[in-house]
């Protein structure tokens, strides 16, 4: 909540590209939220009265993107995330995986510097969860967008480059993937979780 600027920390600072976001106020804060942040939630949180295209375009409209660029940007991101075939459908006509990938497209289409993903695979079956994780990983790699993911799932955490373990509200451990294959990184995550006795509240 502090990173997303919903809450203000009692002390300290939060730097994004060298800018302390805790000091932003008024229009500067609104601009930061509009242009620099993207969100992917456990529930897709799509607007039910808008089509897939309109849901993805929403973040561009709020950002004030030039109208001529909206269509190619939306269709390009939809193609990358595999939801081109649902652009004319409403959320209640989509599968769970399609809804979540449409929500991810909405988060990434504006090219934010930071995307906050809160249990993005929590409501998905294993196949769709895997597709979503691969999508997040490839987008991070291709667009250099920082993704901060909160998850209780060690498998989901294994798709990241760095994992922070929080226990009783404090940072307990940190591991970095480096050049490790994902399978070996997953094993390291499991080792830490086992050491915690299942007490790791979040890994992300």
Region annotations inferred by a language model:
Residues 1-159, 166:
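ABC family nucleotide-binding domain
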Residues 160-174:
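Conserved long hydrophobic alpha-helices within structured protein cores
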Residues 170-195:
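Conserved beta-strand-loop-alpha-helix hinge in the C-terminal portion
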Residues 194-196, 200-204:
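Non-catalytic connector elements of ABC transporters
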């Amino acid at each position: 909540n502090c990173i997303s600027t919903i809450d203000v920390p009692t002390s300290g600072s939060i730097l994004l590209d060298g800018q302390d976001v805790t000091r932003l106020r008024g229009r500067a804060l609104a601009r930061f939220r509009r242009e620099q942040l993207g969100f992917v939630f456990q529930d897709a949180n799509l607007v039910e009265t808008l089509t897939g295209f309109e849901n993805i375009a929403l973040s561009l409209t709020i950002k004030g993107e030039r109208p001529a660029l909206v269509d190619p940007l939306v269709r390009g991101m939809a193609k990358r995330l595999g939801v081109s075939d649902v652009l004319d459908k409403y959320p209640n006509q989509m599968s769970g995986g399609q809804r979540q990938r449409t929500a991810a497209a909405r988060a990434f289409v504006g090219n934010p510097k930071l995307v906050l993903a809160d249990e993005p695979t929590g409501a998905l079956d294993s196949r769709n969860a895997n597709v979503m994780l691969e999508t997040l990983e490839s987008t991070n790699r291709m667009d250099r967008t920082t993704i901060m993911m909160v998850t209780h799932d060690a498998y989901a955490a294994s798709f990241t480059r760095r994992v922070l373990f929080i226990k009783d509200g404090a940072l307990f451990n940190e591991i970095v993937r480096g050049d490790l294959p994902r399978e070996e990184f997953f094993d390291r995550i499991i080792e830490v979780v086992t050491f915690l006795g299942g007490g790791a509240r979040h890994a992300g």
